[in-house]
Every structure is written in structure tokens, then in C-alpha cells.
């Protein structure tokens, strides 16, 4: 009887270790993808900002429960709108930014100060 209990304990321990390793790997992957995308903005042009926004949207699709891609989408959209106020994409980006901020408000672990800052710039 004690061997079966020990066996279950070992299996549960292995399961939890594996789960935590997978979660950590996903977080580091997301951080790496965001870092690569933002690194392309060393010399921000309207094209590079739009490409960064598109990449962040893909990252957000890969990690839908994470706030960081959503924050970067909103931030870069606002950045583009300030740099190119008369560009044809600006109005759509501002609408999408408002929707993104609304999504961020529904995430439990979202930082209220980040949301208020983005909403203030909107």
C-alpha cells in the first residue's frame, strides 16, 4: 500500500515539474519574440512600426492570455498615430487600440496604471 502511495506521489511530482517547465518555456519564448520584434524599431519608420504591430498581433494570437503583446500593440499603434496623424491607417489603428485596451481591462493580472496610461494617450 505504501509503494502505491509513493508511486502516485512521484508521478504527481513529475507532472507538476513538467507543467511548470512548459509554462516557463512559453513565457521565455514570448519574451524572445517580443524582444525580436521591438529590436527592429531601432530606427522607427512608419513601415517598421506597422510591421511591429502586425508581429505583435501574431504573438498575441499565440499567447491570448498574456498582457504584454496587447500592451505593445496599443503602445506602438499610439506611437504610429502620433508620428503619422494624417496617414490612412491612423483612424483604424486608434479604433483597434481602443478595443485592445478594453481587452486588457478584462485580464485579471493587468496593471491598472498601464491601462490608464494608454487610455490617457488615446
Language model segments and positions:
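Generic secondary-structure transition motif, activating predominantly at the C-termini of alpha-helices
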Residues: 14, 38-42, 105
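Amphipathic alpha-helical repeat scaffolds of TPR domains
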Residues: 27-39, 64-84, 109-122
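Bacterial Sec-dependent N-terminal signal peptides
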Residues: 1-33
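Surface-exposed, polar helix/loop patches in the mature regions of secreted/periplasmic/lumenal proteins
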Residues: 90-122
Amino acid at each position: 500500500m505504501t509503494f502505491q502511495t509513493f508511486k502516485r506521489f512521484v508521478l504527481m511530482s513529475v507532472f507538476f515539474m513538467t507543467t511548470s517547465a512548459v509554462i516557463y518555456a512559453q513565457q521565455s519564448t514570448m519574451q524572445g519574440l517580443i524582444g525580436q520584434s521591438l529590436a527592429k524599431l531601432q530606427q522607427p519608420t512608419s513601415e517598421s512600426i506597422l510591421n511591429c504591430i502586425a508581429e505583435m498581433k501574431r504573438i498575441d494570437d499565440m499567447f491570448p492570455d498574456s498582457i504584454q503583446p496587447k500592451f505593445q500593440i496599443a503602445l506602438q499603434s499610439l506611437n504610429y498615430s502620433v508620428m503619422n496623424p494624417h496617414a490612412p491607417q491612423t483612424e483604424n489603428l486608434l479604433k483597434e487600440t481602443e478595443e485592445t485596451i478594453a481587452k486588457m481591462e478584462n485580464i485579471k493580472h493587468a496593471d491598472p496604471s498601464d491601462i490608464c496610461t494608454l487610455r490617457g494617450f488615446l
